[in-house]
């Protein structure tokens, strides 16, 4: 049975950058990795409501200063009135960190939300949770991406589609999505939709362009 590589991990160092940037010695590594995992797990729980597309974690050489860059399609909702939402987020994230860590959060706006695989996956999940037919939800996301002149997009939905007794997977692709071409700038994201029939899995592949070396 054929096994598929992760589209982003496959391209690290070529078209993709690491989402965590820090260095640690042998004794520190496991603890810092756990901190990153706790931060990402918490932010994932609020990502759908706040349209969070990406989270990047940067640390200084001593690993006592953390810079958290959050990319979102709706920065106003995340920041809140007079920064109240951002202050709440800062306090909640600090709960997962030792007392000696200094945390800074930067909220960055995603300029083209229809060119982000994570936000498109959130859109499909939101539609499915509103009990809209899965093909209609996929088509709407495809059309929004095509208006941004992407080279290709593929969306797959898996589970008890439209309440069917037997779970299955269906996908629709428009244009090219060359997963084996390393120079292809592929964006990839997954999301879950909680429906009355169970959980539906959503995958989005977005082929933006080919990055050619000079």
Curated annotation (Swiss-Prot):
Residues of the KH type-2 domain: 39-111
Keyword tags: Chloroplast, Plastid, Ribonucleoprotein, Ribosomal protein, RNA-binding, rRNA-binding
One GO term (biological process): translation
Keyword Plastid: yes
Localisation: Plastid, Chloroplast
GO terms under cellular component: chloroplast; cytosolic small ribosomal subunit
UniProt record similarity statement: Belongs to the universal ribosomal protein uS3 family.
NCBIfam families cross-referenced by the UniProt entry: rpsC_bact
Subunit structure: Part of the 30S ribosomal subunit.
Protein name, as recorded: Small ribosomal subunit protein uS3c
Species of the source: Phaeodactylum tricornutum (strain CCAP 1055/1)
